[in-house]
């Protein structure tokens, strides 16, 4: 942990309080972070990698934590590429709406509706998965992560 950074949770942070992401979308405990399927699956496989402790900037992490976090992000990306046969993985680390380090990993597929646009510009209806469809996606990613380790 970088000097001056707290390991305490931020009481105002939805990620720290466990109200986001949804627990039923949990894929794996990766070490420093957890992986979850994003609520919106318009882009199939859209996954979140969420740092377990509260930090808002990469430079708030110790160098060893940054390295480990990037290894965890890469492991999830590799698994997404395998499961979804992605042509490309988009990596997004923003934090404007939720100031807690979390990556959006978005597989871009052969049938991508807007292959040259960032996902944020693609207007679409929310595509939610639930029940067996959600569990199937989670299990496929869990198996791919297990194989990649």
Predicted regions and their residues:
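HIT superfamily nucleotide-processing domains
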Residues: 2-149
